[in-house]
Amino acid sequence: MTKFLTKLTKLEQEINHPAVKRQVEEIALIDSYVQAGKPLKRAPRRLGLLPDEFEEVLVEVGPDKEGALRDLNNLLNNFRQYLSLIYGIWSLPNIQTAQLIKNKLHVQTALEIMAGNAYWSQALAQVGIKVHSTDSLEWAKTSTTGAKPFYPVEDLPADQAIKKYHTVNLVLCSWSPNFGHGDLETVAAWHKYNPSCHLLFVGEKDGATNSPEFWHQNWFKNSAALDEINHSLQSFDFINEKVVEIKNEF
């Protein structure tokens, strides 16, 4: 994965097609922001070629480049994995979404739990929200990607963090694991210590994040504000990443 960008650039030059070039440039831009520890200004454009797009490009570049095009498309579709392995992040927050969370939900103070490298905390802080970022940091003890968080992270399990920072306007959890019951325990702690604040999860329904039990509950809130927030966070790959909010009463 360390040679990911080099391989991508080499294949793009070999294929020499504007649609491919645009996507490789988008990845280079994203990587430069992440490497600098800065949130993106907006959500990334969609990456990867859909089957019909793949065929259109292949017709234009010729059948002799089919192998290179398939290799490149595989790399495009695995960009999120590259981000996780190199930077320890699964989600790409952006300033536009962070600003909407602040404005539409009237957030002045926030707590990010299970924050990992706290990229979302960095984005929220940049739009003027006072943020407390917490994580048990167990994963960071065995991973080099945990050495350089984007924002200061306090060593604190989720339930204890929610209890300690019970006056915040927002509790945020991005990419809760799709195993165990950490998400259910989070909802229980929030319901006990700070049920009047907003509780947001960033993830994929019935997919890459959160437990099956979490998604099968009748506790999700719908609102025009949430629709607008999600419109600014359109997923860049095959993972249908969205922001979901838990009802204050359920």
List the model feature ranges, each with a label.
Residues 114-120, 179-180:
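Gly/Ser/Thr-rich loops at beta-strand to alpha-helix junctions
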Residues 134-170:
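S-adenosyl-L-methionine
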Residues 84-108:
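Conserved alpha-helix/loop element of class I SAM-dependent methyltransferases that forms part
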Residues 1-92, 237-239:
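N-terminal accessory regions of S-adenosyl-L-methionine
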Residues 117-129:
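Conserved SAM-binding loop of SAM-dependent methyltransferases across substrates and taxa
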Residues 168-182:
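A short SAM/SAH-binding and catalytic strip from SAM-dependent methyltransferases
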Residues 181-250:
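C-terminal substrate-binding/active-site "lid" region of AdoMet-derived donor-dependent transferases
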Residues 106-116:
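Conserved class I S-adenosyl-L-methionine
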